[in-house]
Amino acid sequence: MEFGRLITAMVTPFNDRLEVDYVRAAELANHLVNTGSDGIVVAGTTGESPTLTKDEKIRLFSTVVDAVGDRASVIAGTGSYDTEATIELSRKAKEAGVDGLLLVGPYYNKPPQEGYYQHFAAVAKAVPLPIMLYNIPGRTGSNIIPATVARLMAFDNIVAIKEAAGSMDQVSEVVRLARPDFKVYSGDDSLTLPILSVGGHGIVSVASHLVGKEIQKMIAACINGNISEAARIHRELYPLFKGLFITSNPICVKAALNLLGRPVGGVRLPLVEANDQEVAAMRQLIESYGLDASCQETVA
């Protein structure tokens, strides 16, 4: 399964009562495909997975699958700190028709490396879907080291990793150890080009809600050998990449989408709405990049 090079970690739209707005979720998924996304992660960190119920996640999986059809891959965020619960939700995601699974490293209980291995191995054995591992020690509290990732490559359906440790040394080692068909994705927009330069495959992006086509151009320039053009686009987009993370994600990207007239609602506690300074910062970014609600949308 080829997930694509630009995958958007989609926000979960809520209505004024902070209920999931499935109509707007379908609309947003279509918008993302029309603005350059090859794939969509549903109910990941950016989708506020910790505050979504199991039933909400399953319905979101089906909603996005139905919305995008075969125009993009749909990857379900089903990982948790409970192996059996992860397997159960992953099976439901398969029934919903998703193309793959995003499995975050178990958080809070901080397993040793053998625990990470056995957790991911159990899911890979139980659910015959392509799996993207997700390493984000800044959120989980523990790092999945490259040697553990290499062990997990023995499972044919573990096909990729979203690497968000923020370490180019770690990415370089994972790429060095990877089997030929194993894909390494950046988990940070600002590190997309550096990770591509050492053999990474793509990005699981937040900024692609706003500048998907420009990110696609940067990726294409890099893989086609036009490094100077890729670097130019990277430099141009860098303030946006960083600006969307001046507070906890997805607070800012939701604020930006709302300002652009593409309503996605607020965030669920314990996250809080963007404050006045953060809203002002998003407004300034929108104006400086000349963004509007279409975000350069092209209807297929």
Swiss-Prot record:
Return the annotated site residues (Part of a proton relay during catalysis). 45, 108
SUPFAM superfamilies xref list: Aldolase (SSF51569)
Its cellular-component GO annotations read: cytosol
Pathway field: Amino-acid biosynthesis; L-lysine biosynthesis via DAP pathway; (S)-tetrahydrodipicolinate from L-aspartate: step 3/4
Where do the annotations place pyruvate binding? 46, 204
Family the UniProt entry places it in: Belongs to the DapA family.
- Designated name of the protein: 4-hydroxy-tetrahydrodipicolinate synthase
